[in-house]
Amino acid sequence: MKMETDRLLIRHMNEAYEAAFVRGIADPSLRTAYGFPAEMDETVPPQIFHHFLGLENAFALTEKGRGEMIGFLLDTDPELPEDVQAGLPENGHTLAFAVFPSCQRQGFMQEALQAYIPYLFRNGGAGYIHCGHFTDNVPSREMLHKLEFREYSRHALKNRTIVDEIHF
């Protein structure tokens, strides 16, 4: 899949993005927001990148003006607790995402999701879309609410609380 917005190219992640990805997740604040350990051995970011490469729908977000990866978007099957999953329609998608710290607060992720979400409903037959964020990740919560996601449930993960936001 190739998708384009006013400022972004959204492309399947490939080996060419590895260096930018490793640089991008070097910031401990991003690691914490995403649930990675704030301190990690230098061998871990490449391992995370290669794990993402193994996913069917792992996308690199590239700013057109820079031509460099500024973040990522992952589209996976939902991994929600059974009691939460039971009340939802079939064919759900979970989106996980991050914009690297040097490019945050510029609307890039909102722009990417505004393009990708309608695509999932129109072409992917999505019954719903799920995004989770930690309770202390206020920017993600505010952005998701602008995109008409609503809090559906909460559950514990890695000694923190995840808020499950759903878009129908």
Outline where the language-model segments fall:
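Conserved GNAT-fold acetyl-CoA-binding loop/helix
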Residues: 30-49
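Acyl-donor (CoA/ACP) binding surface of acyl/acetyltransferases
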Residues: 1-33, 58, 62-168
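Short loop/turn motifs at secondary-structure junctions and domain boundaries
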Residues: 50-55
